[in-house]
Design a protein with these regions (language model features):
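GNAT-family acyltransferases
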Residues: 1-102, 107-110, 123-127, 131, ...
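Conserved active-site alpha-helix within GNAT-family acetyltransferase domains
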Residues: 118, 144-159
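Conserved hydrophobic beta-strand within the GNAT/NAT acetyltransferase core sheet
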Residues: 136-141
Length: 174
């Protein structure tokens, strides 16, 4: 199974079958990956977004693009030593004709302010930029989400505009 590894984390992209299993029984999906059962503390708004993404994006898009599923799936953020999922990260699709893709991430509240999100975002952006077809990665966050904004800037994303109540950041290939 393909995964990315950083100092403390594994980033595991979920296949279509694993996403389907996750929708049915997250604990069974974690067990299949050899992970300990997680008990994530996630903001209810993000839970709704995750359920919507699973049903209306990740599952159908990984089925439609099996050869490029890495660009359309959730990557579990896993603590290597503890074998524990603490969040998710990924892209909203294969880079467009301008070489642009978008990333998003979520981390269990129990693991905020420990550098895990920075490590995961750095790892996945480095992986994306290793593909010649990627020139720009964008990320969007709400104007009031200061921790996310700070994280994006620490990883090298720069403010690039605003769309309604969302701030847009981008990072260019160096």
């Amino acid at each position: 199974m393909f995964f990315l590894e950083t100092e403390r984390l594994q980033l595991i992209p979920l296949t279509h079958d694993l996403l389907t299993l996750c929708q049915q029984d997250r604990a069974a999906m974690e067990a299949k990956l050899g992970l300990n059962k997680s008990d994530m503390r996630i903001d209810p708004l993000y839970m709704t977004e995750l359920e919507d993404a699973l049903t209306h994006f990740w599952i159908p898009m990984t089925a439609a693009h099996p050869d490029r599923y890495l660009w359309y799936t959730n990557w579990e953020i896993v603590l290597k030593e503890e074998r524990l999922a603490i969040g998710g990260i990924g892209f909203i699709g294969y880079p467009d004709e301008n070489g642009q893709t978008e990333t998003g991430f979520m981390l269990d509240k129990n693991f905020h302010s420990k550098g895990y999100a920075k490590e995961a975002l750095t790892g996945i952006t480095n992986w994306a930029f290793s593909h010649v077809e990627v020139s720009t990665i964008i990320a969007k966050t709400t104007t009031d989400n200061l921790p996310s904004r700070t994280l994006l800037e620490r990883v090298g994303f720069l403010p690039a505009g605003q769309e309604a109540d969302l701030l847009i950041y981008n990072k260019q290939r160096v």
